[in-house]
Amino acid sequence: MVNENKWGLLYCPRGGWRSNKRWEKIEKVLKQQGVDYDFVQSENQKSVERLIRMFINNGYKTIVIVGGDSALNDAVNCLMQIDPKERDEVALGVIPNGLMNDFAHFWGFSDSDIEKTVASLKKRRIRKIDLGCIRYVNKKGEKCRRYFLNCINIGLIAAIMNLRRKTHHIFGSRTLSFLCSFILMIFQRLDYKMHVKINSDVIRRRVMTMCIGNGTGYGQTPNAVPYNGLLDVSVVSHPKTTQLFEGIYLFVKGKFLNHKSVHPYRTREVEVLDAQHALIGIDGRLMNTPVGPFQITVIQEVINFLIPV
């Protein structure tokens, strides 16, 4: 078994020509700060869960993901498959290195300040955090569940994020990639027939997009925190074209909830009875569309997460 103070570090390459330089900089900071770690590199989504399980089986108590929201999602889903007592001995940390790093940014971890991030992780300050959980039936008729740290998107934003993943290598800039994806999506389907239950409210109308956030949801659930046992929900009805561009402006400015087409909620459970033809994204990555109704809930204080001092 390994030294309990040694990190199990999982590097998830972001892609692009600067990927190696990014890792060299991170490696240099780790050495400068005297971090004792073992390093593995992921090849794809499936390898993340396999490598996390390898770290756990070999007794690592601190697992640090050098990656983004999707890699963190894979990590927590692996942790949720092990015995709760064993999971309680493991702390999860992150050095932001993904296309989308919203959950890391919530805690104040910066993509650019690697020195500060590593110094904070070394302090091993732990906070127990909540996870969201979607329960659904897949195309094979199997009952499934998937956990999330940040959010689930249903509708337009899920489609935009999928397009953004495909275009970020072209545009380089994350903001430019997102805005271009948004504009491209205007020429496609903008709303979806939905039937949703939130608390005592029943929503049965055409909806452009819905975000269920355990975290800030890429700006759509800006008041959500992953430690209050609640989910924040924003439901966006189909705005007029002028309102749509106003919505883009407010989204970029961080004032998304101020838009007249946005309807915010706070709840412990969301029941989606119908979301016809809408894509579903979980922590920034498309998931296989559930067959029939599905439920989204929150599970309190199940992951030990390393936060800044």
Task: Show which residues each predicted segment covers.
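ATP/NTP phosphate-donor binding region
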Residues: M1-V66, N77, A119
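Catalytic core of DAGKc-family lipid kinases
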Residues: L10, Q33, Q81-M208
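Short N-terminal binding/cap micro-motifs at the start of the first secondary-structure element
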Residues: G16-N20, A159, G219
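ATP/nucleoside-binding phosphotransfer catalytic cores, i.e., glycine-rich phosphate-binding loops
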Residues: N20, I198-N199, R204, N228, ...
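Short amphipathic alpha-helical segments
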Residues: K21-W23, V76-L79, H105-W107, N223-A224
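Short beta->alpha linker loops
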Residues: E43-S47, G67-S70, G98, G155
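Short glycine/serine/threonine-rich phosphate/pyrophosphate-binding segments
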Residues: V48, A71-A75, I129
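Glycine-rich phosphate/pyrophosphate-binding beta-alpha loops
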Residues: N153, I157, C211-P222
